[in-house]
Amino acid sequence: MAYIEFRNIRKSYDGENLVLKDLNLQVNEGDLVTLLGPSGCGKSTLLRSLAGFESIDGGSIHINGQDVTDFPPGKRNIGMVFQQYSLFPNMNVAENIAFGLKMQKMDAATIKEKVARIIELVELSGKEDHYPTQLSGGQKQRVALARAIVTEPKVLLLDEPLSAIDALLRKNLQKQIRRIQKALHITTIFVTHDQDEAMLMSDVIHVMASGKIEQSGTPTEIYTHPETHFVASFIGNYNLLSSSDFEKLTQKKTQASQIAIRPEAIEYFKEPQPRTEDHLYFKGKVIDETISGNILSYVIETDQGVHLRADHLYRTFNLLDKGARVFLKVEKRNVLEF
């Protein structure tokens, strides 16, 4: 049985336009699940409805088999971390983390023990007496995370907590959050619009669009087998082709309205290759190139005037110059039709 379950959730802010449209979603115990989608798709509204900060107009929300739809936030035993750290400026690290425990009226010895354990877990040892103004952005976010989990909630909600942090630090925090979540085995829902973040951190990804779940699956399933044109356009950097462009390339009719090909599925060669039945073959010239980290991307204009992007690990051999003639092939199983 699912640990968290959304059943036919409906939500409107103006009484007419639905932000959440009869949405159904399940989360297994101990998983880190990501709600991934563009701004305005309803992902934060869904998260806040689970926390009890937003009412719903229809449906029900269940945690561990219990209907919590009408429970106030304080009765749901949920920890939440926002993009804003919301730390108390007049309290040091230890005091900020201990705040929730004091509200639960725990004894001082238990509070001290729990705070010490969490500080070690989030790697803030030695910062106990520091105030928020003395901390970096990453340290502040770890304090906010520690404060959310020290009370041992049943569920942890993370609403774009890393979006205001620079790229390098964000990658380190992504790994730390995942490590902590696994160590505590806490059921977690993470909201982001960053596909790379979702791929790195998630057990399961739910791609959202216009108040609905477009597709659910593991990161590998979502990336390699997008079920809709929207998912293909939002995940990765697929080459998205119209049916007419694809027919130009292949000289064959297609029943699909859209075609998607991953850039890394396109192989390139300086010479023509032997043909097989399970591949498609194109010819063209290099019109642009970019390097992102260790990924080299070529933009190739085929002889039919269709632009394709081909991605590969950067190597010092088999490099192509702009204007170079190039021969492409792609396995037919990597050509997705919608």
Q: Locations of the language-model features?
A:
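Helix-to-loop junction immediately C-terminal to a conserved catalytic motif
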Residues: 51
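Non-catalytic connector elements of ABC transporters
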Residues: 249-338
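Conserved ABC transporter NBD signature motif
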Residues: 59-67
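The feature captures the beta-strand-to-loop junction immediately N-terminal to the Walker
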Residues: 36-38
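ABC ATPase nucleotide-binding domains
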Residues: 32, 73-227
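ABC ATPase nucleotide-binding domain helices that frame the ATP-binding cleft
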Residues: 44-47, 143
